[in-house]
């Protein structure tokens, strides 16, 4: 074999698994615990510095623990850790534990938003965090966001505004008011069968209101409702019978047997109202149990009209008819025992034979009805409405009954002189500028659309004035859910002082305008939030195929002085540039976005099957925003992508190993490109990536795998005039298990665990340490000297020496 003699300019190009013939010069088979540098060449990595053991009771962390670092300032740097049962916070500079809600020893997760016991994933895979200034948003990817159905906007008051728009001589102004009043009264009729003939008893009344049971079909003769059929059933002495119940409007009929249980209809809807009760035996035979009693309970409407007159007068009759197709009436009238009315004595009843085919009705002349037997049917106006007048305005308010009513204005000027506002109007111009403070009304938009309807509330110029001049301001629809359930929202962890954290749920602004159609909740409602991001002064969440960005701004203070984010519109009459953004990706495949990373002026979205870009024009607004697919490369969502400078790095599965892609915008073609940077080491990085971080100042990327948790796989790169001149892979090995790490400036912080006991500690590695560092003891060992004296007392009497 001939001797090959060549020169290598350096040995900084790192590991390559390619054949020797295709490798670049300066690459090697293995590089362990060295650092590649275009300035210093190949140098040994710096040693670790012990900071402190975690926890007074020796905190243990497994590879499933969630770890997140917080870089508040050069003097305050923290790490938050969730080991599956508790959330801890520590200062990585001093090693001191930080309090959470004023308590040391960790925040117990059980029964809270941080409880991951029901998740099929570990705490590491279930939790995600994003830090913005002094606040950290913590996401539980197994928790569904819900709404708070207990907190709703007030129901609409049953009141109307009546105002004179135009006055004229000898013109008539009037109102038609139609309404129901008071509590319905009821009566009972006991009917006793004495023979086997078939009878159907029918019942009529003025205007019943509520429903217990009913249905069927029939016809109306005057004010009397007749039955044809209604099939329902009951069991009487183990025999099934048919019950015929008539049809009417707003009535309540209850049928009960005196012996073996209750006979009742099955349909209680207002559309199927029982008026006539009849019984038929098996095989079409008629009941022949002598002494069998049927009880009918009928509820009647009490409806006084405005001014004291009744809508249905007290002459409304309750009549009982006997129906037989071939015979005249055969009932023993003496056995119809009583009619019991509330607060009234029992009146007489009329018994009329009736031919079911409608050919003839035989009635006596002495039809007697209820005739004042319900003493409270007529009620005074004052009990039903109150009136308040100020100037040309009358406020008509429903009384204690609070039931709905209809009102219509009439005038002698073609309907343009007297105005009425009740529940809704056709246009905002239909509303007076002199009204009751707090009066709310719906303003209809396009008749074919519901999304353009909106609601307004009157505010007097003088807030202490009940009725007066003022203006109409937009408000929320009545009886509308206002906000999300606080306990289902992500956590917001605030750094309130040195080594102090406050934990609370994210506050969201309650819905203040519109309704479920014009201002729906964000699309994360009823869904699981996957991740969070902060982009162009908007807090964002990714959920399914949607990206949701809050109202522009760093949140806002509410009336209580508390900080909150708004995910609803502030007006539904127009679309504002600052309004929240809720947009879905454009893709022909099922897409589940799990991460987002800002890149220059755009937001890059990552799904398992592709990447998307969210962008707007000069301003990001609901009108200018768009989301489009840009690349279709696989992404492993076990860890979030890492943004370093103008590049984004993200992992993907490469068989039983892991590959890394470098995502960037090509400045020449203005096209996004995703380049694999592990082409020379396809079998180097193990799978099951747990943590992924990088340093912009050191052009360094670090990767931790659960399959090799005592090694960090490192990638060092360097660009010169848009050309990458260094692309070096290597690894750093430790005698401790690495649970998490983070690059902050030129320092690498690691959370490590004893390889045997899993007792955890904080250590750090300076990346550009030159051997001289203030605050470190330096001692030169000469000759046979075996001892030295330390000027400090290390915690736990454990000392790590950096030997050089």
Where are the regions a protein language model picked out?
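Structural signature of eukaryotic scaffold interfaces centered on beta-propeller domains
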Residues: 60-75, 119-132, 522-535, 585-600, ...
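Long, charge-dense tracts
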Residues: 135, 158-165, 308-523
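Catalytic or ion-translocation cores adjacent to nucleophile or general acid/base/metal-coordination motifs
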Residues: 617-656
């Amino acid at each position: 074999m001939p001797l090959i003699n060549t020169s290598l300019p350096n040995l900084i190009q790192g590991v390559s698994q390619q054949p020797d013939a295709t490798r670049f010069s300066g690459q090697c088979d293995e590089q362990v615990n060295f650092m590649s540098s275009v300035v210093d060449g190949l140098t040994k990595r710096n040693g670790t510095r012990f900071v402190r053991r975690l926890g007074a009771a020796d905190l243990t962390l497994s590879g499933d623990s969630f770890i997140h670092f917080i870089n508040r300032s050069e003097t305050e740097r923290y790490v938050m850790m969730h080991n599956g049962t508790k959330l801890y916070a520590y200062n990585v500079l001093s090693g001191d534990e930080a309090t959470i809600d004023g308590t040391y020893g960790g925040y117990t997760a059980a029964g809270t938003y941080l409880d991951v016991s029901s998740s099929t994933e570990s705490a590491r895979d279930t939790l995600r965090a994003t830090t913005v200034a002094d606040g950290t948003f913590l996401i539980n990817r197994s928790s569904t966001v819900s709404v708070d159905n207990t907190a709703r906007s007030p129901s609409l008051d049953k009141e109307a505004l009546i105002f004179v728009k135009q006055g004229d001589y000898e013109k008539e102004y009037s109102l038609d008011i139609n309404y129901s009043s008071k509590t319905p009264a009821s009566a009972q009729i006991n009917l006793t069968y004495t023979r086997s003939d078939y009878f159907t008893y029918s019942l009529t009344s003025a205007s019943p209101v509520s429903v217990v049971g009913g249905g069927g079909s029939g016809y109306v003769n005057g004010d009397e409702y007749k039955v044809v059929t209604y099939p329902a059933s009951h069991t009487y002495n183990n025999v099934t019978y048919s019950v015929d119940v008539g049809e009417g409007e707003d009535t309540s009929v209850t049928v009960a047997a005196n012996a073996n249980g209750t006979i009742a209809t099955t349909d209680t809807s207002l559309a199927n109202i029982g008026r006539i009760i009849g019984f038929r035996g098996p095989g079409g035979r008629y009941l022949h149990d002598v002494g069998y009693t049927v009880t009918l309970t009928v509820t009647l409407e009490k409806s006084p009209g405005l001014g004291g007159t009744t809508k249905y007068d007290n002459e409304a009759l309750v009549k009982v008819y006997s129906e037989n197709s071939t015979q005249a009436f055969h009932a023993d009238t003496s056995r119809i025992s009583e009619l019991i009315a509330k607060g009234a004595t029992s009146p007489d009843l009329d018994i009329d034979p009736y031919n079911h085919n409608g050919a003839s009705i035989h009635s006596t002349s002495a039809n007697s009805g209820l005739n004042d037997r319900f003493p409270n049917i007529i009620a005074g106006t004052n009990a039903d409405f109150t009136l308040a007048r100020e100037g040309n305005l009358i406020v008509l308010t429903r009384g204690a009954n609070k039931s709905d009513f209809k009102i219509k204005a009439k005038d002698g000027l073609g309907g343009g002189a007297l105005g009425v506002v009740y529940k809704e109007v056709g246009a905002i111009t239909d509303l007076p500028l002199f009204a009751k403070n707090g009066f709310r009304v719906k303003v209809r938009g396009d008749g074919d659309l519901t999304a353009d309807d909106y609601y307004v509330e009157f505010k007097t110029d003088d807030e202490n004035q009940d009725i007066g001049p003022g203006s109409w301001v937009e408000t929320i629809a009545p009886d509308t859910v206002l906000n999300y359930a606080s306990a289902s929202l992500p956590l917001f962890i605030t750094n309130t002082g040195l080594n102090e954290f406050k934990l609370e749920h994210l506050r969201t602004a309650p819905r203040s305008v519109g309704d479920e159609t014009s201002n729906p909740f964000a699309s994360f409602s009823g869904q699981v939030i996957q991740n969070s991001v902060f982009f162009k002064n908007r807090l964002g969440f990714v959920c399914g195929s949607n990206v949701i960005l809050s109202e522009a701004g760093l949140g806002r203070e509410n009336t209580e002085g508390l900080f909150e984010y708004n995910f609803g519109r502030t007006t539904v009459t127009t679309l504002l540039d600052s309004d929240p953004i809720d947009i879905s990706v454009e893709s022909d495949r099922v897409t589940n976005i799990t991460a987002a990373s800002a890149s220059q002026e755009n937001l890059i979205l990552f799904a398992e099957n592709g990447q998307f870009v969210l962008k707007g024009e000069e301003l990001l607004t609901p009108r200018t925003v768009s989301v489009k697919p840009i690349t279709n490369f696989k992404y492993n969502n076990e860890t979030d992508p890492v943004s370093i400078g103008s590049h984004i790095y993200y992992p993907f599965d490469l068989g039983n190993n892991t590959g890394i892609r470098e995502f960037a915008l090509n400045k020449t073609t203005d096209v996004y490109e995703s380049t694999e940077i592990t082409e020379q080491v396809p079998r180097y990085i193990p799978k099951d990536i747990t943590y992924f971080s990088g340093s912009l100042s050191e052009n360094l990327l670090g990767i931790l795998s659960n399959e090799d948790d005592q090694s960090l796989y490192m990638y060092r790169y360097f660009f010169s005039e848009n050309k990458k001149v260094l692309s070096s892979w290597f690894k750093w090995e430790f005698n401790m298990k690495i649970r998490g790490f983070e690059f902050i400036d030129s320092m690498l912080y690691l959370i490590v665990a004893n390889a045997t006991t899993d007792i955890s500690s904080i250590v750090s590695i300076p990346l550009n340490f030159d051997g001289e560092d203030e605050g470190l003891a330096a001692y030169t060992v000469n000759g046979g000297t075996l001892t030295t004296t330390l000027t400090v007392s290390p915690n736990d009497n454990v000392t790590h020496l950096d030997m050089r």
